[in-house]
């Protein structure tokens, strides 16, 4: 956290421990190193976030019924399968869930404004789902999961919870290279998909979304 400007400088008043440094020029190099080690680009994940941020940020809500709601339920169920697999450190299962998620997103057929809103979201689900399916290590699947979590959050904000069970918005401050990251899960207890068994309970539950209800707040 930065304090008031002092000439050409901004003092850091919180969020930085003694001896730690702030990266101001090497972000691209750090991001490239992450990709080389099997993770998804943090910058491309941020770009994905713009896909539906406008609609969700404006508080847009679209109610779906019947087959349309069932199709989005299949998308969220596949995402949740990946969430559980990564929390359990089960890479192969995460790959399978990624393939299932990609196919579920492709199968969604909406009309009118719902279709226009869903189109950029579907592109992210399909691309990142395939990225997880084709990942060479669990780190790659977790990188894809970061972008998928952003989009799943937006899905809950725009279309509501299409499932017959509650889902939760969870947050870990140490995920995403200590920048923090959210994800969606069904369990009431934190199951950290970014770290698995190493830090399974690291994080907090921020919100619960009941069936048919919408996640409140801005998209990103």
Where are these regions (language model features)?
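Intrinsically disordered, low-complexity terminal tails/loops enriched in metal-binding residues
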Residues: 1-220
């Amino acid at each position: 956290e930065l304090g008031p400007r002092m000439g050409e400088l901004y003092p850091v008043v919180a969020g930085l421990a003694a001896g730690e440094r702030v990266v101001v020029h090497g972000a691209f190099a750090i991001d490239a190193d992450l990709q080389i080690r099997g993770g998804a680009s943090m910058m491309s994940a941020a770009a994905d976030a713009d896909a539906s941020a406008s609609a969700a940020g404006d508080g847009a809500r679209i109610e779906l019924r019947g087959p349309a709601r069932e199709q989005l339920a299949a998308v969220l169920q596949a995402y949740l399968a990946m969430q559980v697999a990564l929390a359990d450190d089960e890479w192969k299962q995460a790959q399978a869930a990624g393939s299932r998620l990609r196919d579920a997103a492709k199968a969604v057929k909406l009309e009118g404004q719902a279709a226009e809103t869903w189109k950029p979201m579907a592109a992210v689900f399909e691309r990142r789902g395939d990225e997880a399916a084709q990942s060479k290590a669990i780190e790659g699947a977790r990188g894809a999961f970061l972008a998928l979590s952003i989009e799943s959050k937006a899905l809950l904000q725009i279309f509501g919870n299409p499932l017959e069970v509650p889902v939760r918005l969870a947050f870990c401050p140490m995920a995403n290279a200590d920048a923090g990251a959210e994800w969606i899960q069904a369990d009431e207890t934190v199951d950290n998909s970014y770290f698995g068994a190493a830090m399974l309970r690291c994080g907090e539950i921020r919100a619960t979304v009941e069936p048919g209800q919408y996640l409140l707040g801005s998209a990103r």
